[in-house]
Design a protein with these regions (language model features):
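Short acidic, gly/pro-rich beta-turn/loop elements at beta-sheet edges
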Residues: 59-61, 93, 163
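Active-site clefts of carbohydrate-active enzymes
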Residues: 24, 50-56, 107-137, 155-172
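Non-transmembrane alpha-helical segments in soluble domains
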Residues: 39-43, 70, 105, 141, ...
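Substrate-binding cleft of extracellular glycoside hydrolase catalytic domains
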Residues: 1-81, 88, 125-131
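Aromatic- and acid-rich polysaccharide-binding/catalytic face
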Residues: 14, 20, 66-122, 151, ...
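Aromatic-rich peripheral "rim/lid" segments of glycoside hydrolase catalytic domains that contact
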Residues: 7-8, 99, 143-185
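A structural motif corresponding to the C-terminal end of an alpha-helix
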Residues: 42-47, 76-79, 107-108, 142-150
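Aromatic/hydrophobic pocket-lining residues that form the small-molecule binding cavity
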Residues: 31, 35, 97, 133, ...
Length: 185
């Protein structure tokens, strides 16, 4: 029999992230209406709340998953303190990444957290080398550090193969040594 394990502890954090990729079947997989109905429970924690982090194609525009969520949240007076986003680049274009972040900030008028980012080709996971990942990490970090509305960012993933995709994006290898990406951070 499974035991109850609370996901929120008194850890000293003042922030709580919303649902992870609710627009994706293999992630939290929920409708906007389901997320809106659960949101008051997150608000009741008293923590600063990050929006649900949608996949990139469902982040921008009024008709996107996040656009509909934010419209309904605002109409109901629900609190969303910052917008959490994911960004996976297939072309190493940091200028496009910056434009995406600026568009998110312009549309939602809130601070932005990039809670997952890396180079990724889901059809060919090993397409990008560790050196390419490291360079994207370096240039992307510099770019985000220059954007005053980006409060946090978290690279994907912590250790190579830990994501199940083998994107050459891990910060640590299987022995716990820093990879080229890890040395950037």
């Amino acid at each position: 029999r499974a035991a109850y394990v609370p996901l929120i502890h008194k850890s000293g954090t003042g922030d709580l992230l919303g649902f992870n990729e609710p627009d994706e079947r293999k992630q939290s997989n929920m409708s906007v209406e389901q997320a809106i109905s659960l949101w008051p429970k997150l608000e009741s924690t008293g923590l600063r709340l990050g929006s649900p982090a949608t996949s990139r194609h469902e982040t921008l525009g009024k008709a996107s998953w996040l656009g509909r969520f934010m419209t309904q949240a605002e109409a109901k007076g629900l609190r969303v303190d910052f917008v959490a986003v994911h960004y996976y680049s297939t072309d190493k274009d940091v200028a496009a990444f910056r434009e995406f972040l600026e568009a998110v900030h312009k549309q939602y008028k809130r601070p932005v957290w990039v809670t997952e980012w890396a180079l990724a080709d889901w059809d060919d996971p090993s397409r990008f080398s560790a050196a390419e990942q490291a360079e994207f990490a370096r240039v992307g970090t510099e770019m985000m550090d220059d954007l005053p509305f980006v409060e946090r960012h978290a690279w994907f993933a912590a250790y190579e193969g830990g994501d199940g995709w083998h994107l050459n994006s891990g910060i640590f290898d299987s022995r716990g040594n820093l990879t080229p990406v890890g040395k950037v951070f």
